[in-house]
Structure formats: C-alpha cells, structure tokens
C-alpha cells in the first residue's frame, strides 16, 4: 500500500480505538461490511438498474443489487426500494426531482428545531430550487406540535411535507402527518436517516403505511456502509422515483457499497439486532435521565430514540474540551437557539457506536459523569488530562477491530 495513505489509515484506526464515540450519526460496521466495501465490485460501472443496464458485463452486479433491493424490502416491509443513492442527501434530492417542479412549496422542520439541511434550508439545494416553509416544535414541551404543522400546511399548501429529523429525540406520529398531508393534497416524505435501525427492529413506528416515500441513510443506526436508500408503497410514483435517482441525479451506482448495503440489511434481520437496538435506546434514556438528575436541561426532557441533546450554554467549547479527553460528539443548536450554528448552545449525544463496541448501561453512566466533570471544570486542562486517562483505561476492555492493521 502507498506509505502515506497506509500511515493515515492506521492513524485513523488508532484514533477510533482510543476514542469514545458519541456522535449520533456514526457507528462501527462489521468486518464483513468493511471487506465488501473494499471489494473488487468497485471496478464495475453499471448505469441503470438490474437487467436494464447501459453497460455490458453487469450480470454479476445485477445479482448483488437485486439481493440488496429484496432484502431491504423484506427488512422494512416495502413494496419497492432503490438502493443506489450515494447518501441520504442524494436520496432526498432524487425524491424532489421525481415529485416536484422548481419553485414548488415544501414544508419541513426548522433546522434550529432539529430539521436537516435538505428539508428546506436556504443554503441547501432544497431551499434554493424550491420554496421552503418550516414548522417548529412546541417551545414548552420541545416536542412536535402537530397543530402547528396543520396550520402552516393549510396556509402554504405545500406540494411536499417532510417528516424526518437530524436532532429530534421523540417518537414521530406518522399517521398524524399523513392526515395533514392528505388534507392539503401534499406528498408525504419520511426521512428516517437517524431512526432507520429503530424502525427495522420494530422499536419505532414504521412510516411506510402512512407516507408516499421514505428515505434513509444506511450508516447510522442501521450500522451499514455510508450510503442512502429510497422506499415506497405508493406504486403510482415508483417509476418517477427510479428516474429521480437515475438519470435524474446520479450516473453509475457504487456497486461495492450496494453489496455492503445488502450485508447490512441481512445483519439487521438477525434476532440479535433487535436486542442491539433495544440496548441503544436503553443506554440513551439512562444517560439522558442521569444528566437531568444533575440539573442539565435535556431537550424535550428525555428521549425515545438513540440520541438526545443537552443545553450546555457553549456547545463548541464543550465539544472541543471533550475531544481533548478522547470523548467525541458534536456541538448542536438547541430549539430556538439564540447562538449561531457555528457556536451553538448545545451538544448532541448518541449511543449507537459505543453500544456496538460493547458498552452497557453502567459504562454510559460512567461516561456521563466524565462529561459532567469536564463541563463543571470549565475545560480545566488538568481535569481533561485525568478524564483522557480514564477513557483510555476504560477502552482497553473494549477492543475495536482486533487484529486489523493496514
């Protein structure tokens, strides 16, 4: 291997081994997924869909893509699936291309309240090519206000309503969203990038019976390779959705990643995966409860999912202090945050990655105490050094990718 990139790979491997990862959108894939993602399939160009390609020599990748499609449908109970999107953003873009015209109104959750860039943010394609409107959350409960969603939808008459979030910790009522969309004549898109694993495990309501289309990533709670997917039970729009991906916004799909997605879906069908997701939820709820007992403002007063947010006043400083102690998470805005996104008030904490690594409830509570110690020290260098030492000692008991070296 080229020496410079070998050094970087081993350096990153060591960083992952030596850090407690609490980034809600990250996880550790299996060795099988690592291997398939780096496989010979990366060599094959395969524009089009199985049995309908624009290149010859696709008979083998037709098999792997068909496996991925069918296993995805089995996992989520979908009538149709497209596994070609390179990311969640690509999946959303393809849906917009398929169902909307430039300038059409879209309605999504405000970014500061937990929405995503691709749900209508003015700096994103979704806010530039379409007319974006937003709903917020109840400022008291910090939960979705379905009455407000209905009020705004009646007012702006969107062509598409998006229910899906990057930082919302409560169960989503897809049935209520469906009723709102039907009343105003809008398509309903559920972006389940964060909660896909919970849905797959049956530990969060499935949006497919209530929505026109569902998008997701494969690399968060699903614990797969980096990528996206689209699903639908609305047979009237599936040809449009296929065209939205190819030729709409992508050319050749990444066949090595698609094969790894199949492995991911297959792993998520195993009984032990449901127990994993249950542990993820339990660990997040326990951590959130502990912080609440210590007097922290936990957004929405808790969590039903794999993540939660804390208002710590200075999220950027806190996230940087924690990184110095080998605890990695991300700064995040809190609802109605008066601070800018580059220096927000909050931090976001997720439990999928370290649950994969073997952490139990007691380990997460120990880490919560370490986080609390650093915050209360106001980033004291001596305290950070002590916490880093404790982190490294704890991680000795949880080896990551044992025997792997580049």
UniProtKB/Swiss-Prot annotation:
In the record, which positions carry N6-(pyridoxal phosphate)lysine? 220
Q: Per the record, a Pfam family?
A: SHMT
Q: Does the keyword Cytoplasm apply?
A: yes
Q: Tell me where on the tree of life, at the top rank, the source sits.
A: Bacteria
Which InterPro entries would you find in this protein's record?
PyrdxlP-dep_Trfase, PyrdxlP-dep_Trfase_major, PyrdxlP-dep_Trfase_small, Ser_HO-MeTrfase, Ser_HO-MeTrfase-like, Ser_HO-MeTrfase_PLP_BS, SHMT-like_dom
What CDD domains is this protein classified in? SHMT
Gene3D superfamilies, A to Z: Aspartate Aminotransferase, domain 1, Type I PLP-dependent aspartate aminotransferase-like (Major domain)
Recorded family membership: Belongs to the SHMT family.
UniProt cross-references to HAMAP family, sorted A to Z? SHMT
Purpose of the protein: Catalyzes the reversible interconversion of serine and glycine with tetrahydrofolate (THF) serving as the one-carbon carrier. This reaction serves as the major source of one-carbon groups required for the biosynthesis of purines, thymidylate, methionine, and other important biomolecules. Also exhibits THF-independent aldolase activity toward beta-hydroxyamino acids, producing glycine and aldehydes, via a retro-aldol mechanism.
> This chain belongs to which protein, by name?
Serine hydroxymethyltransferase
Q: Which gene encodes it?
A: glyA
């Amino acid at each position: 291997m080229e020496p410079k990139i070998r050094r970087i790979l081993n350096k990153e491997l060591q960083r992952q081994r030596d850090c407690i990862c609490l980034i809600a959108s990250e996880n550790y894939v299996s060795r099988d997924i690592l291997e398939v993602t780096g496989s010979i399939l990366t060599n094959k160009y395969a524009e089009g869909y199985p049995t309908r390609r624009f290149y010859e020599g696709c008979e083998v990748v037709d098999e792997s893509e068909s496996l991925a499609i069918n296993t995805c449908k089995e996992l989520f109970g979908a009538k149709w699936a497209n596994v070609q999107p390179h990311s969640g953003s690509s999946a959303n873009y393809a849906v917009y291309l398929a169902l909307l015209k430039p300038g059409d109104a879209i309605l999504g959750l405000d970014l500061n309240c937990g929405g995503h860039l691709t749900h209508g943010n003015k700096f994103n394609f979704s806010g530039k090519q379409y007319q974006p409107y937003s709903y917020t959350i109840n400022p008291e409960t910090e939960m979705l206000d379905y009455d407000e969603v209905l009020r705004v939808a009646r007012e702006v008459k969107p062509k598409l309503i998006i229910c899906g979030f990057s930082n919302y910790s409560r169960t989503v009522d897809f049935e209520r969203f469906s009723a709102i969309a039907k009343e105003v004549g809008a398509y309903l898109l559920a972006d389940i990038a964060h909660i896909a694993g919970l849905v797959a495990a049956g530990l969060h309501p499935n949006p497919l019976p209530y929505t026109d289309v569902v998008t997701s990533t494969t690399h968060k709670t699903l614990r797969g390779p980096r990528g996206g997917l689209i699903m639908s039970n609305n047979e009237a729009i599936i040809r449009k959705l296929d065209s939205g991906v190819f030729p709409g916004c992508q050319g050749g799909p990444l066949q090595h990643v698609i094969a790894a997605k199949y492995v991911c879906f297959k792993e998520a069908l195993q009984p032990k995966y449901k127990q994993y997701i249950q542990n993820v939820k339990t660990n997040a709820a326990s951590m959130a409860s502990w912080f609440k007992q210590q007097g922290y403002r936990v957004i929405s007063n808790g969590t039903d999912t794999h993540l939660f947010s804390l208002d710590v006043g200075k999220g950027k400083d806190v996230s940087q202090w924690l990184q110095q102690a080998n605890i990695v998470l991300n700064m995040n805005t809190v609802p109605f945050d008066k601070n800018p996104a580059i220096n927000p008030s909050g931090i976001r904490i997720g439990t999928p990655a370290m649950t994969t690594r073997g952490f139990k409830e007691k380990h997460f509570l120990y880490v919560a105490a370490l986080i609390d110690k650093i915050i209360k020290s106001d980033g004291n260098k001596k305290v950070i050094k002590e916490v880093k030492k404790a982190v490294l000692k704890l991680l000795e008991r949880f080896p990551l990718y044992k025997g792997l070296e580049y």
